């Protein structure tokens, strides 16, 4: 409850800072302040935020009084179905047709990158709360980007370095074949090697895979001490269950 409310208050605060300053003031001259939320509402990452994340945003808006400088706050939401083109199209439509002032992006790094690009083009604030790719922190960060979520560099340094210190020297990666998986595997591998460990192999699985048994057999055959799961949500659960 506290985390969700704090998250939402951050969004409201950024809305005020971004919308009601300088040239952005004219962008919020319509009858309401519109905040969009695009995430996975029905797929493998839906339990990470999904409808729960939407409700948290609505609760935060209510806590804030439902208004910013006398204008009501309206929350729009959509399911990107884990497709970058759908996420980008909806974000663009909301700005052009609904007067969207700020967008909150949920899980899935590929969709987050596409929404980030659209919002930069439209000069609107984009808050990433669910995607972990370090590209949002680094080369694809814009003056309109707020990366509230952790990124894969931070995750890799905190986790891999601790495992190495405990003796986990040889690694094999099971990688979700999209932006987040690639970033996490690459960043973790860099930490492993810099810490004196080795990466004996990796294998990519399609984002749609729910049966990861065959991939895990290859990981087992590698004789690595550590299996690094560079995936998330339902796919991480499936991998853990299959590993049993």
Which residues does each PLM region occupy?
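Extracellular/periplasmic Venus flytrap/periplasmic-binding protein
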Residues: 89, 134-135, 142-244
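Beta-alpha junction/loop-to-helix N-cap segments that form part of ligand/metal-binding clefts
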Residues: 32, 48-53, 63, 67-136, ...
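Glycine- and acidic-residue-enriched helix-capping/strand-helix junction motifs
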Residues: 44-55, 179-183
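Short beta-strand segments enriched in small/hydrophobic residues
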Residues: 32-50, 106, 170-174
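Gram-negative bacterial Sec-dependent N-terminal signal peptides
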Residues: 2-25
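Immediate post-signal peptide segment of exported/extracytoplasmic ligand-binding proteins
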Residues: 24-37, 66-74, 164-169
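A general alpha-helical scaffold signature found inside nucleotide-binding enzyme cores
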Residues: 51-59, 143, 154
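Alpha-helical structural signal in soluble globular domains
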Residues: 60-64, 114-122, 187-195, 242-243
């Amino acid at each position: 409850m506290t985390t969700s409310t704090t998250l939402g208050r951050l969004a409201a605060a950024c809305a005020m800072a971004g919308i009601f300053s300088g040239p952005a003031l004219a962008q919020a001259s319509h009858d309401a302040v519109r905040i969009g939320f695009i995430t996975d509402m029905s797929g493998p990452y839906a339990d990470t935020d999904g409808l729960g994340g939407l409700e948290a945003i609505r609760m935060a808006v209510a806590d804030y009084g439902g208004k910013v400088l006398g204008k009501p706050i309206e929350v729009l939401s959509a399911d990107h179905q884990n497709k970058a083109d759908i996420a980008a199209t909806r974000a663009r439509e909301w700005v052009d047709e609904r007067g969207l002032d700020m967008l909150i992006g949920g899980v899935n790094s590929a969709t987050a990158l596409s929404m980030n690009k659209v919002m930069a083009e439209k000069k609107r604030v984009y808050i990433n709360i669910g995607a972990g790719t370090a590209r949002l922190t680094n080369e694809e960060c814009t003056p309109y980007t707020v990366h509230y979520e952790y990124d894969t560099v931070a995750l890799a340094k905190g986790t891999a370095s601790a495992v190495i210190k405990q003796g986990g020297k040889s690694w094999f990666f099971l990688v979700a074949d999209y932006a987040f998986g690639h970033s996490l595997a690459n960043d973790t591998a860099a930490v492993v090697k810099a810490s004196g460990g080795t990466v004996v192999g990796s294998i990519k699985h399609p984002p749609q895979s729910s049966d990861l048994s065959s991939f895990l057999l290859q990981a087992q055959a590698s004789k690595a001490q550590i299996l690094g799961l560079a995936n998330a949500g339902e796919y991480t659960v499936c991998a853990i269950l299959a590993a049993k």
